[in-house]
């Protein structure tokens, strides 16, 4: 077997049972990975220097094809209502078949870290059969110093073979696509999908499983911090496509990370060393920091259409998918944190993409309301972020990231509530979805409005304004905010048909109530009293 690059020879591919490989390219950096990806016709060059790849039929995650090995160690630890399972024997067969499929192939390996805090990080080795996948995951996770590679010993191993086709009868899955995690062996197998996001979310899922036991709260959120001497941080929870990356990229604040973080007794820390930003309808004027990364060597653009002659990206072209993305190292953002760490948050923002158009652009939550809305995780699945999703769909994704949370939501909710109370954190619910009507009749909340409201929340001025109680949801909504039209703050005033608004709001409240029934036995009376209808009746 030929080896190219630097690695710990005492812990090579044989340690995971990968044998008879044609070659392994170890820890290659961007220039070499560009060469390999272009030589293999895996990708193209865009004007400006980014590498552009397409992912075929899988242009988003495949959550229904994700499985956890159900064994003695996980039986009572995993939330099986939300996680598919396979047996240890089925996983063993799958792993053997992955090994057989890899024989004779050239693979690319990256030795990386998940977690900027050395006390709470995982050493993740990622094997891929595509060179551009290797660059993608190198961009997204944290890269060790080259001098440390010779002593690197992996804790978690990911094997990503898009050309592998699973056999449902043999492997216990439902299709030819499979994402299987064995927490006991610390192995992840990804087959039948070239969507690169599966790799990063597998690391996230692993950390979401192991960290709560150490008292660390893993979070599907972005984070930034003020540039002044206080350095106070803010967290932005939200499902993919709700604005986490866009809103945390603020030139007036330091970016900690755009998607995955931990909150320990020492503060917050990024799980990653890069960003994975949506690029559909990306604008140089509206999102200059992200736009600039698409014109840099080293960035990977996924399913972005480029002109066949000029190689200029067309960010308005959704012919491949709405879920177009770019992946780049965190240091491509000028104001990004060099450490990926910050102190305890002063503010938490829960982003919801309200597909009904009845929620206000911002609301202040009590501790109990924050717990309620965190467990509810109301949002809309935005087109393209999952396979087969072509239009926004109202949903409840508990913890604002149900597909990645292997444990019961109450584990994460209780940790969050405890940390919020301990550090006196203000919590805000922000609607980046629709206003003036639902999907098809209303319009998306203007980003300038969201940015203005967030600025007021983060600098402390919003907490000082007059608030009213929302008649449907019970939370506190600002009456006036300088620089924002008063009408926008009151959703009913943006609808021409007030009766239709009332009917729609009532329907959404009913959805909240039905969804939360599964959590009622896991929360106290204060959280149950934060239920929208209960709050409205009490008013």
From Swiss-Prot:
Q: Which UniProt keywords apply?
A: ATP-binding, Cytoplasm, Decarboxylase, Gluconeogenesis, Lyase, Manganese, Metal-binding, Nucleotide-binding
Q: Which residues bind ATP?
A: 201, 220, 238-246, 287, 325, 450
Q: Which residues bind Mn(2+)?
A: 201, 220, 259
Q: Which GO terms describe its cellular component?
A: cytosol
Copy out the cofactor comment: Binds 1 Mn(2+) ion per subunit.
Primary residence: cytoplasm
- Family annotation (Pfam families): PEPCK_ATP
- From the UniProt record, give the pathway where this protein acts: Carbohydrate biosynthesis; gluconeogenesis
Q: Does the keyword Cytoplasm apply?
A: yes
Q: Which GO terms describe its biological process?
A: gluconeogenesis
Gene Ontology molecular functions: ATP binding; metal ion binding; phosphoenolpyruvate carboxykinase (ATP) activity
Q: What is its EC number?
A: 4.1.1.49
Q: Has the keyword Lyase been applied to this entry? A: yes
Which HAMAP family does the protein's record reference?
A: PEPCK_ATP
Q: Tell me its family.
A: Belongs to the phosphoenolpyruvate carboxykinase (ATP) family.
Query: What's the stated role of this polypeptide?
Result: Involved in the gluconeogenesis. Catalyzes the conversion of oxaloacetate (OAA) to phosphoenolpyruvate (PEP) through direct phosphoryl transfer between the nucleoside triphosphate and OAA.
Q: What is this protein called?
A: Phosphoenolpyruvate carboxykinase (ATP)
Q: Which organism is it from?
A: Methylorubrum extorquens (strain PA1)
The beginning of the lineage is: Bacteria, Pseudomonadati, Pseudomonadota, Alphaproteobacteria, Hyphomicrobiales
As recorded in Swiss-Prot or TrEMBL, the protein's gene is named pckA
